[in-house]
Design a protein with these regions (language model features):
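Glycine-rich ThDP/TPP pyrophosphate-binding loop and its adjacent helix/strand module
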Residues: 34-35, 83-218
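Cofactor-binding active-site loop characterized by glycine-rich and histidine/acidic residues
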Residues: 3-4, 8-140
């Protein structure tokens, strides 16, 4: 609904991405609240999914729900990419797509006793920065968990059509990550993969295969 209001006003915005990663966000937040040692900041390498962070801010009592009606409006603070200096509910500004993993590694170096969660995407994983960050995480056994929305959709189309042979899981496995793959809309599978990742001290990727915006008519 938040993204729909913006579109109706001609402000644009993204619906599929933030809608996709609601299940894994709820699972991680619940595990953290239940006492699992997960760093409390929210890192999303796909900043255009900012709508979810704003909704999460409301749920966590850090923002009034009325503000959601002004998503992407100038001066509202609810920018298309999240900016922490504009809203208290935003932990981290990820910049453009695919540029968060290196920063997340830094957080992992500074917080070795907690798991550091990064929400990723198949599109972001095509960026070269991620390859460098993955190798650094493996070399230092950083306790990072990349939960990746793999919906086979990017702004350029479907990766399976224009980048033959590219596979997120195989790529990360080749770089040394432990990889779990699940149906992102099978919540039992998703929960199991996330909890397994948290039992491992070191870099793990959970690849969530799904259709973008499940249940939303095209």
């Amino acid at each position: 609904a938040t993204t729909a209001f913006a579109r109706a006003k001609g402000l644009g915005g993204h619906t599929g991405g933030p809608y996709d990663i609601v299940p894994e966000t709820l699972i991680v937040d619940s595990l953290r609240e239940g006492g699992t040692k997960i760093h409390d900041e929210f890192f999303d390498e796909a900043g255009h999914r900012s709508a979810l962070q704003y909704v999460r801010g409301v749920v966590r009592g850090k923002m009034d729900s009325e503000k959601l009606l002004h998503y992407r409006e100038y001066g509202s603070g609810l920018a298309g990419h999240p900016e922490p200096e504009l809203l208290d509910c935003i932990d981290f500004s990820t910049g453009r797509l695919g540029h968060a993993a290196g920063h997340v590694n830094g957080v992992a170096f500074a917080n070795p006793d907690s798991a550091i969660i990064m929400y990723g995407s198949d599109g972001a994983q095509m960026e070269g920065n991620n390859a460098e960050a993955a190798r650094l995480a493996v070399a230092n056994n950083l306790n990072v968990k990349w939960i990746i929305d793999d919906n086979n959709v990017t702004i350029a189309g479907h990766p399976e059509n224009y980048m033959a042979g590219f596979d997120v899981g195989n790529t990360l496995e080749g770089q040394g990550f432990k990889v779990f793959t699940c149906d992102g809309e099978n919540y039992t599978e998703l929960y199991d993969c996330i909890t397994k990742s948290l039992e491992i001290n070191g870099p793990v990727a959970v690849i969530c295969k799904r259709v973008m915006g499940p249940g939303i008519p095209e």
